[in-house]
Amino acid sequence: MVELEKRRRPPPQLQHSPYVRDQSNSQGMTKTPETSPPKRPMGRARSNSRSSGSRSNVDIDQYTIPPGLDLLPTASSPPSVHQVSQQQQLSPILANKIRSPFENQSQDQNDNSIDPTPAGQVTIPVEAVSPPALDELSKFQNGSTETLFRTGSPRKKHTHIIILKSLNATFETKFLVVPFKPDGLKLGRPVTNSVNKNNSGSKRDLFSQQVRPDNGNFDSRVLSRNHACLSCDPTSGKIYIRDLKSSNGTFVNGVKIRQNDVELKVGDTVDLGTDIDSKFEHRKISAYVEEISVIPLMNTVSDPTNLVMKKQDHTNKNNGNSTNINGIKIDRGHHNQHIPIRSHLKENYTEAGVTSATTAQRAAFEAAMFGDINNSELDDDILGPETEVLSGIFINNSAGTSINLINMIKTLTTELSLEKQELEKLHSMQNFMQNYTINLDFINKHMIDMNEKHLLKLSTALQKTLSENNDALLKESEDQLKEIKQQNNKVKSACSLKEKQNHEKLQELESELRELNLQIEEERGKNLVLTQSNFNGGINNDNNAKVKQNDSREEKKDTEDTLISTEELGVVEGKRTRVSKGMLFGVVAISFGLVATAVKQLPQ
């Protein structure tokens, strides 16, 4: 059994794995012949490897650790050189330089040449891992095998969140986590793989299920499935948008963009597509960049409970004495003396569910206090040349640095820097409060003086304004009064002139009336004389006519039988003319009387 275990070689180093330390290429270690362990040169040399989580190619969460490893007892005796080598291979340490299979083979030969079995200790029986298994280990084990961590990618201790608010009520407010380049967040219409194509209601339900406030899907027919893409520059922290050859185009502040990156800032408007008609399903997506937040990623140290992946390939064989970790079989009975595990970690890790709420509260507090701090600028200042310190901790005994210690020191340095900044803020607040309380009387007096000066300025300005307004009103009223007086004088002069004209006209009318009265009196006298004369003449004429009539009657009686002579006819005609003349004179007298009565009735 011992000879069989001697012939078995240790597990090969995994490519792109943080669980491997390159002993052959690392600075500070020299490769010796196969019959002797590696020798360390005199003096301290600086290690080129970086701590995990900073420059690693693959995250720790990509590997599956069996939960039974926490229950293994610690080693009772110090490990040998070969055991330290295997412990370095199984311990999670970052290696920037990946060895080729030929180097792995030479290293395996060197390890086989060393006596691996001191008293009471044996090696770990491990099966070789094929190259396809190495590729599988380099991928995510959380259900998606599309995203890979790229070599040399910077630490991502913060994330950018962009808040898009709708301008035309086409979607709910979105809170999008923008990934770093070369990754991107797709914006577009969700893809539905509905079996029943005629059922439009089910398709609409699928659309509504896929459109959420935390993804880039929008429910609009004018959008393409791959319409636009959001990405963040890891060096500058700027957020960019680019069009993905959409049919209806992408517009930033009303300007159509192409396939190149365009920076987004707070206050910009983003239009996806164009309006086809007034219906809701054919409207464009008009969004407003309300805010861009920088949130630090809390709890970057992965708990062992998080190291166990969803797709864990763990089986127990040989009556519970062997463990299979993704194709690597480890003898559980012989592993207990090679990987020392602290017994107190189990108690802390079992309380992960209890401390999750505290972690969430702390994350919210840190995001509120330090959300405006760009962690990429603090990496070198906070952590510094961390591997120079951390790699030299176990360099004297040819042991690697534990990933837990590295993460613990990183977490402590980060927390110390944040606490220092918080303390500086508190100190500044304390200084402000002290200065405020000390200078409170002076500040109050100064404020009172300033208020009095301000009040005086306001009062003088108000008085000046009121006086100017009063003067303007007085001047305006005086002008109006003068104008009214002038108009009154004009009216008085016009009235006096009119009265004078009326008086003169009245005098003229009175004089004319006097003259008419005199003329009427004269006419009355004349009429009276004429009437008397006419009356006397009429009586005489009547008497003469009667006498003549009597005479004529007598003559007629005498000469009834005789012929009337021409002389008698002439006499008769003369009588007729006399009668007509008397009648004419009477008519004239009557007319004069009527005129006199009419003149008397006229107003004086």
Curated annotation (Swiss-Prot):
Chain residue ranges for the region called Disordered: 1-89, 539-561
Would you name any one GO CC term? FAR/SIN/STRIPAK complex
Query: What is the name attached to this protein's record?
Result: Vacuolar protein sorting-associated protein 64
Q: List compositional bias (Polar residues) regions by residue number.
A: 22-34
Give the domain of life: Eukaryota
Q: Locate the compositionally biased regions of type Low complexity.
A: 44-57, 77-89
Query: Per the database record, which ranges form the FHA domain?
Result: 185-257
One Pfam family assigned to this protein is FHA
Q: Which organism is it from?
A: Saccharomyces cerevisiae (strain ATCC 204508 / S288c) (Baker's yeast)
- Report the coiled-coil segments: 404-563
Task: Give compartment(s).
Answer: Endoplasmic reticulum membrane
The transmembrane residues are: 579-598
The task this protein performs is described as: Participates in the control of the reentry into the cell cycle following pheromone treatment. Involved in vacuolar protein sorting.
- Name its GO BP terms in alphabetical order: cellular response to pheromone; protein targeting to vacuole; re-entry into mitotic cell cycle after pheromone arrest; regulation of cell cycle; TOR signaling
- Please name the gene that encodes this protein: VPS64
- InterPro entries noted in UniProt: Cent_Immune-Sig_Mod, FHA_dom, SMAD_FHA_dom_sf
SUPFAM superfamilies (alphabetical): SMAD/FHA domain (SSF49879)
Question: Its membrane topology, per UniProt?
Answer: Single-pass type IV membrane protein
Task: Indicate the quaternary assembly.
Answer: Component of a complex at least composed of FAR3, FAR7, FAR8, FAR10, FAR11 and VPS64.
Q: Does the keyword Magnesium apply?
A: no
Instruction: List where Basic and acidic residues composition bias occurs.
Output: 548-560
Q: Which residues lie on this side of the membrane: Cytoplasmic?
A: 1-578
